[in-house]
């Protein structure tokens, strides 16, 4: 995945951050019945819109066996991910109620829309697109 997690980049060279992970669900199956893929990688705010690639160096598996060579394939575009909340307790002297802040904690999972769906946005973004 290539992007700017929580605004981080290589400012000196003007380059985004490249991270790696694995698919948490099979890329050819629709996650939760939608054209989505679940990813097991560090996905933080600022990563939405990042392209997610499959990159194989040296060899990769195909239905007919092992292919020697390199491959890069646009898998999808990250748009979100599950988070859970942790409630902490802050204590203040002489206060009858104890505030309980809710903190979102990333699960290091992300959800991407499949690359096959990218052109569907044309129907939404281009009012002159024939339907």
Locate the predicted segments by residue.
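A residue-level detector for short acidic-glycine micro-motifs
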Residues: 3, 25-27, 54, 79
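Short glycine/Trp-rich loop-beta-loop segment that forms part of the substrate-binding cleft
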Residues: 1-11
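Terminal peptide-recognition signature
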Residues: 1, 23, 48-52, 114
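PDZ/PDZ-like groove recognition
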Residues: 87-131
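Catalytic nucleophile loop of clan PA
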Residues: 41-77, 88-93
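Gly/Ser-enriched beta-turn/beta-hairpin loop segments
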Residues: 13-17, 26-35
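Short consensus segments that form the blades of beta-propeller domains
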Residues: 11-15, 66-67
């Amino acid at each position: 995945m290539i992007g700017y997690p929580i605004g981080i980049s290589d400012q000196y060279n003007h380059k985004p951050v490249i991270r790696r992970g694995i698919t948490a669900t099979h890329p050819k199956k629709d996650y939760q019945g939608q054209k989505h893929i679940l990813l097991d990688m560090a996905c933080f705010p600022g990563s939405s819109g990042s392209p997610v690639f499959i990159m194989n160096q040296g060899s990769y598996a195909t239905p007919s066996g092992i292919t020697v060579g390199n491959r890069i394939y646009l898998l999808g575009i990250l748009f979100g991910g599950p988070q859970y909340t942790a409630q902490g307790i802050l204590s203040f002297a002489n206060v009858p109620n104890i505030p309980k802040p809710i903190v979102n904690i990333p699960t290091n999972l992300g959800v991407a829309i499949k690359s096959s769906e990218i052109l569907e946005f044309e129907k939404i973004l281009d009012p002159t697109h024939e339907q």
